[in-house]
Structures are given as C-alpha cells and as structure tokens.
Amino acid sequence: MNQTLLSEFGSPSQRVENALESLRNGRGVLVLDDEDRENEGDMIFAAQNMTVEQMALTIRYGSGIVCLCLTEERRQQLALPMMVERNSSHYQTAFTVTIEAAEGVSTGVSAADRLTTIRAAIKDNAKPTDLNRPGHVFPLCAQPGGVLVRGGHTEAAVDLTTLAGLKPAGVLCEVTNDDGSMAHAPEIIAFGRRHNMPVLTIEDLVAYRRALMREVS
C-alpha cells in the first residue's frame, strides 16, 4: 500500500489508534487490504453501537451485501452452519447461512430491520431461535488468531472491535463508486475525508498486533 497516500491519517500505529478511538466513539472506520489481494476498502462499524443512520449510509454507499463479522464461538452459540461445506472461493471468505431477526422486523431489508437482526445476533444471551434463516444479513466467521492468521476484512473487523474493548463483532460492507465499481485507495481516502472516518490498512493492524505481542513477551 502506498504509505504516502495515507500519511494524512498518521503513522501506521496512529492509524490503528485513531480507528479504535473512532469505534469506541460510535463512528465507523475504513479498512484497505493489500493491493495484491482484493485491493478494496470496507466500511466497518462496531456492531455494538452501530446506528440506523450508519446502516443507511452503509447501504447507500456500499455494495449492498451487509456482513456481520463474528467469532467462531458466537457462530456456534447461534448454531449457524457455514453457507457451503466446501469453500472454493478465492479468499476462502467464511460465509454462514444468512439471517433475519425472528422478531421486530418486517421484510428484513430496511436499514432498521438489518440493524435489528444484528442486535439480535450479538446480544449476550442470543440463541439460535432468535434468528430466522435465510435473511438479509450475511454473517462471516473470523479465523481464530485474526489478521495474524488471515489478512481479511472479516478478521480486521473482529480484531478492531476486540482491541477497542467492545463486543467482538463488526459490521462491514465494501465501498463502491457512483458507477458501481469497487472503490480503491484514492476513492476510499476521499470517502474518509467526506464522512470523517479514519482510514487504515490491514497491514497496519498486523504490525500493531505484532507490536503488542512483543510488549507482552
């Protein structure tokens, strides 16, 4: 990733710290992956404090595929089977079956309904019967070990919310341009300026986590 493009958002460690503070304060962040990987930017919000307005923003400026990133432990708590037995997607993106809140939604498509579904899935005492299947929210299961094991947006969402001291669950959606094409670094940076969202890379988060591990050891 071209570090010059991101310099206005601080050093790599500052970018992570800014992202954590943003999530704690109920704001979103923008996460870029490697140029040799998907080369895309995702909006990420903490599931715990996401608002209807933020969900509407996500739907309006994103791909429309709103994903809820969960730990394996939470996936098992909700008894969510994986979408397929054999994952042949290029980056092994770990989709489960889609979900809908069993109560409190109409068609499940609106910003309010999707947020109701997310809140049902992350509440402390959530159980499988709280959710109907299929639905309009796409859960993703993060790899244990996070970005140190898999450098994906799913793992970044769970790592960031965990490091922020929030529930380990994030809502993400790929950012798209007005013409429907995928947004890359220059467009993501411009989007961050417009919507007051810090930008960081998965590479930043990997380095940050490794530094924390060195401090502990």
UniProtKB/Swiss-Prot annotation:
GO terms for cellular component: cytosol. Binds 2 divalent metal cations per subunit. Magnesium or manganese. Keywords: Lyase, Magnesium, Manganese, Metal-binding, Riboflavin biosynthesis. One of its GO terms (biological process) is riboflavin biosynthetic process. Pfam families: DHBP_synthase. Transmembrane segments: none annotated. The keyword Metal-binding applies. The keyword Manganese applies. GO terms for molecular function: 3,4-dihydroxy-2-butanone-4-phosphate synthase activity; magnesium ion binding; manganese ion binding. Pathway: Cofactor biosynthesis; riboflavin biosynthesis; 2-hydroxy-3-oxobutyl phosphate from D-ribulose 5-phosphate: step 1/1. Its cofactor is Mg(2+); Mn(2+). D-ribulose 5-phosphate binds at R37, E38, D42, R150, G151, G152, H153, T154, E174. The record marks H136, E174 as: Essential for catalytic activity. InterPro entries: DHBP_synth_RibB-like_a/b_dom, DHBP_synthase_RibB. Mg(2+) 1 binds at E38. It catalyses: D-ribulose 5-phosphate = (2S)-2-hydroxy-3-oxobutyl phosphate + formate + H(+). Its EC number is 4.1.99.12. Mg(2+) 2 binds at E38, H153. Belongs to the DHBP synthase family. Catalyzes the conversion of D-ribulose 5-phosphate to formate and 3,4-dihydroxy-2-butanone 4-phosphate. Homodimer. This is 3,4-dihydroxy-2-butanone 4-phosphate synthase. The gene is ribB.
